[in-house]
Amino acid sequence: MAKEKKLVEAITSMEEDFTQWYTDVVKKAELMDYSSVKGCMIFKPNGYAIWENIQKNLDAMFKETGVENVYMPMFIPESLLQKEKDHVEGFAPEVAWVTQGGLETLQERLAVRPTSETLFCELFSKTVQSHRDLPKVYNQWCSVVRWEKTTRPFLRSSEFLWQEGHTVHATAEEAEARTVQMLNIYADFCEKYLAIPMVKGRKTDKEKFAGAEATYTIEALMHDGKALQSGTSHNFGDGFPKAFGIQYTDKDNKLQYCHETSWGVSTRLIGAIIMVHGDDSGLVLPPKIAPTQVMVIPIQQQKDGVLDKAYDLKDKLSKDFRVKIDATDKTPGWKFAAQEVQGISTRIEIGPKDIEKNQCVIVRRDTREKIVVSLDEVNEKLAEVLETMQNDMLEKAKAFLASHINDAHDYNEFKAIAETKPGFIRAMWCGDEACENKIKEDTTVTSRCMPFGDQEQISDVCVCCGKPAHKLVYWGKAY
């Protein structure tokens, strides 16, 4: 029993030290390991399999809307990166540069892509001539490099995996519609597959993406009450097209500039899953995204027939679910603890007494509820358990979010909430960046978004300066 206890004790309590808890979970659940390059990490099979499931399901949702996948080079010539002034200034501190190829010094530095707007713009400028060529709706799955000073696994790293979509359209209306459509796809995906509710809204001008006319965001609330920007969608208007000469002839044979969008999510979503659903025993994965949905654990497996029956059960379940069996010689208690640390959605226990009764025991990872089911009906019952678990995890996360949104009507109330109540603060804002800066300086709280669905005028004046205000903003401390 000491070994099982040690396995679980290796994870710090989240109430004691949330930061250390997170670090312990990503290591003990075998999601990642540190590499010899600071800020870069190794995805282990458990971690990469989660990303594969995110990629598979999100990619299918993209393609339903006409998105096509492409792949762009990793390197961007410096002259190309500098074509859009605001964009390059926004990324300059984080860009990694290649200055030498083999034994030769390069005539022009090459940026290791921090994002690929400029490459897509170059492509669009060559391939778009007529209104018949539009829209172009492209996406790529790749890694990008941003030389971060402070890094944390899955949340902020010097190299990370993501998808970046880039589109060009004939009209501003079409571009805006695509920008919002992709944000809605992200939010729907996170609810349906990750069991994470999102606050959707528009970023303030201070927080928007460099070079964008408008940035829309999905914001999730972590267990410690901090916000996590989990996906963004940008409307670039005709700024990039003008810088890169992306034009088309319309139906009247007149030359017009295109309107452009970009949108992306990254492996940061794995960090969100960990911090929304995890507990002191480790990872808790929603069944729809879990690499392994059920672990079969034989009890007293040394007894005649137990292992054979456990393998038969695994084969039967494998027709409908993602299944593994733990037939190692470790104790059942150790196996239970290992399954819980790794966040496997359920386990099925089967031993000699169960076999006599033609039954097995399903145990949910999130609640540890035990359900005795007939072996004849195990597939049907497990499907019900997994569906219920997925729904329960979403409802629990929704309840947590709703209970951690507080309204502030004046600045003293705002500061008191920021100091004592984790979560989002709803407050009115006049639109002046000076107030936004003051709030951040005084409280470390930043504007997260101006929400789409929530337009309640909770006050007539700005929470900071007291001037007339018409913009409701969600504020919060954030990763």
UniProtKB/Swiss-Prot annotation:
Main EC class of this protein? ligase
Question: Its GO CC terms?
Answer: aminoacyl-tRNA synthetase multienzyme complex; cytoplasm
Pfam families in UniProt: HGTP_anticodon, ProRS-C_1, tRNA-synt_2b
Question: What is the superkingdom listed in this entry's lineage?
Answer: Bacteria
Which InterPro entries does the record match to this protein?
Answer: aa-tRNA-synt_IIb, aa-tRNA-synth_II, aa-tRNA-synth_II/BPL/LPL, Anticodon-bd, Anticodon-bd_dom_sf, Pro-tRNA-ligase_IIa, Pro-tRNA-ligase_IIa_arc-type, Pro-tRNA_ligase_II_C
Share an example GO biological-process annotation for this protein. Answer: prolyl-tRNA aminoacylation
Q: What is its EC number?
A: 6.1.1.15
This protein's record includes keyword Nucleotide-binding: yes
Keywords from the UniProt entry:
Aminoacyl-tRNA synthetase, ATP-binding, Cytoplasm, Ligase, Nucleotide-binding, Protein biosynthesis
Which SMART domains does the record match to this protein?
ProRS-C_1
Q: What does this protein do?
A: Catalyzes the attachment of proline to tRNA(Pro) in a two-step reaction: proline is first activated by ATP to form Pro-AMP and then transferred to the acceptor end of tRNA(Pro).
Q: What binding partners and quaternary form does the record give? A: Homodimer.
- What name appears for this protein in its UniProt entry? Proline--tRNA ligase
Q: Which organism is it from?
A: Agathobacter rectalis (strain ATCC 33656 / DSM 3377 / JCM 17463 / KCTC 5835 / VPI 0990) (Eubacterium rectale)
Q: Please state the gene responsible for encoding this protein.
A: proS
